[in-house]
Amino acid sequence: MSLIEHIDSAQQTWETVTEGVEKIVLRSKPGENRVLLRIAAGKGYPKHGHSVPDEVFVMEGIYIDPFVEGGKEFGPGSYLYYPAGTEHNATTSTGCTILVWNSNVPK
């Protein structure tokens, strides 16, 4: 029988990544990384890339990536797939919460 892991994110403490950016690590094991990322209005996550694919699901607010169609806005329910090696960053005018899924291998 498999053990089902669960986390109540409402009971977790947000960890500061950089000014205006916080995270809750949901899963971090070799080859597995699941993170809730909360970005304050007017703030952003620095440009970066990964040697593996990176996936983003927008849960709340407006997520903007200046590298996608010149800064396209993505609302709740939007899904983005970044192929391995793709540089990207995140900004928001409203504040946003996203779920990030990757293999935790920085480029």
Please provide the spans of the model-predicted regions:
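Conserved short histidine dyad/triad with adjacent acidic residue
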Residues: R27-H50, I64, P83-G85
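A short, N-terminal "cap"/entry segment at the start of jelly-roll beta-barrel domains
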Residues: M1-G31, L36
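Short acidic-glycine-tyrosine-enriched beta hairpin
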Residues: F67-G85
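Ligand-binding loop in jelly-roll beta-barrel domains
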Residues: A84-K107
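Glycine- and acidic-residue-biased ligand/ion/polar-headgroup-sensing regions
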Residues: H50-V68
